[in-house]
Amino acid sequence: MNFLDESFWLAVSFIIFVYLIYRPAKKAILNSLDAKILEVQEKVLKAEKLKEDAALLFEQTNAQIQKLETLRSQMIEESNEVTKKIIQEKTKEIEEFLEHKKSDAIQLIQNQKSTATKELQDEFCDEVIKLVSEYFQSAKFSESNIAKNLMDKSDSSHNNDKST
């Protein structure tokens, strides 16, 4: 290899040229890479923070869901109890109403029964009085007829005795 050869000096010049260009470019490249690294690190930190926030939000949401489930269960239980209580009250009211209606119906039946009994007794008494009155009138008539007949018979027999 000859040091005076053009190819050699061309190669050396090229290496020096590359070195001179690389040196300032190295700083720019390193600065650019450092900036990219910082940017990526910031994005990673933001992503981790978002992940933590999402996990916290998920936990809070789950806690709220649990509270709402508990509240829903309590509300359902309370509404069932209130419903049962209302049903019991209304059932009791209906039973009292029916009992009252039953006693009213029994009282009405007894009143109608006593009224009907009194009417029948009054009709019976009126009929008996009428029959007794008719009997007495017919008996008076009969008595007067009997007395007349007896008198007539006694007169006839008395007249027959006299004739004989």
Curated annotation (Swiss-Prot):
The protein's name in its UniProt record: ATP synthase subunit b
Record text on subunit structure and interactions: F-type ATPases have 2 components, F(1) - the catalytic core - and F(0) - the membrane proton channel. F(1) has five subunits: alpha(3), beta(3), gamma(1), delta(1), epsilon(1). F(0) has three main subunits: a(1), b(2) and c(10-14). The alpha and beta chains form an alternating ring which encloses part of the gamma chain. F(1) is attached to F(0) by a central stalk formed by the gamma and epsilon chains, while a peripheral stalk is formed by the delta and b chains.
Transmembrane segments: 7-25
Its membrane topology: Single-pass membrane protein
Function: F(1)F(0) ATP synthase produces ATP from ADP in the presence of a proton or sodium gradient. F-type ATPases consist of two structural domains, F(1) containing the extramembraneous catalytic core and F(0) containing the membrane proton channel, linked together by a central stalk and a peripheral stalk. During catalysis, ATP synthesis in the catalytic domain of F(1) is coupled via a rotary mechanism of the central stalk subunits to proton translocation.
InterPro entries: ATP_synth_b/b'su_bac/chlpt
GO MF terms, alphabetically ordered: proton-transporting ATP synthase activity, rotational mechanism
Organism: Rickettsia felis (strain ATCC VR-1525 / URRWXCal2) (Rickettsia azadi)
CC terms in the record's Gene Ontology section: plasma membrane; proton-transporting ATP synthase complex
HAMAP family: ATP_synth_b_bprime (MF_01398)
Record family assignment: Belongs to the ATPase B chain family.
